[in-house]
């Protein structure tokens, strides 16, 4: 797994025990799944708007926010990024149509 993702996943796990007054991530965890999902949705919209602008810096910045909040959602759900990477690896080499057909 990418070292940055691994380090970030470890940090996000540690933040589950942090003081919400001193940690943004701990604050999100304390607020609960609905707050995390709302934030994830906001970041998805901001990423779409950045892509529409075709401004590379904005796209990168907003995608980083989207990925970060996706990792928070995974951690809150008791999942790790390597599980998502394993799923991507499983799909690698499958056509999109074949993968969709495999889902039933």
Curated annotation (Swiss-Prot):
It catalyses: 1-(5-phospho-beta-D-ribosyl)-ATP + H2O = 1-(5-phospho-beta-D-ribosyl)-5'-AMP + diphosphate + H(+). InterPro entries: HisE (IPR008179), PRib-ATP_PPHydrolase-like (IPR021130). CDD domains: NTP-PPase_HisIE_like (cd11534). It is found in: Cytoplasm. GO terms for biological process: L-histidine biosynthetic process. GO terms for cellular component: cytoplasm. It comes from the Bacteria. Its main location: cytoplasm. Pathway: Amino-acid biosynthesis; L-histidine biosynthesis; L-histidine from 5-phospho-alpha-D-ribose 1-diphosphate: step 2/9. Its EC number is 3.6.1.31. Transmembrane segments: none annotated. Keywords: Amino-acid biosynthesis, ATP-binding, Cytoplasm, Histidine biosynthesis, Hydrolase, Nucleotide-binding. GO terms for molecular function: ATP binding; phosphoribosyl-ATP diphosphatase activity. It is an enzyme of class 3 (hydrolase). Belongs to the PRA-PH family. This is Phosphoribosyl-ATP pyrophosphatase. It comes from Nitrosococcus oceani (strain ATCC 19707 / BCRC 17464 / JCM 30415 / NCIMB 11848 / C-107). The gene is hisE.
């Amino acid at each position: 797994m990418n070292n940055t993702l691994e380090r970030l996943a470890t940090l996000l796990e540690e933040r589950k025990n942090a003081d919400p007054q001193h940690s943004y991530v701990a604050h999100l965890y304390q607020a609960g799944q609905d707050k995390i999902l709302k934030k994830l949705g906001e970041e998805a919209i901001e990423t779409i708007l950045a892509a529409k602008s075709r401004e590379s810096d904005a796209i990168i910045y907003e995608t980083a926010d989207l990925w970060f909040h996706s990792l928070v959602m995974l951690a809150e759900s008791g999942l790790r990024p390597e599980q998502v990477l394993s799923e991507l690896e499983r799909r690698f080499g499958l056509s999109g149509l074949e993968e969709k057909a495999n889902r039933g």
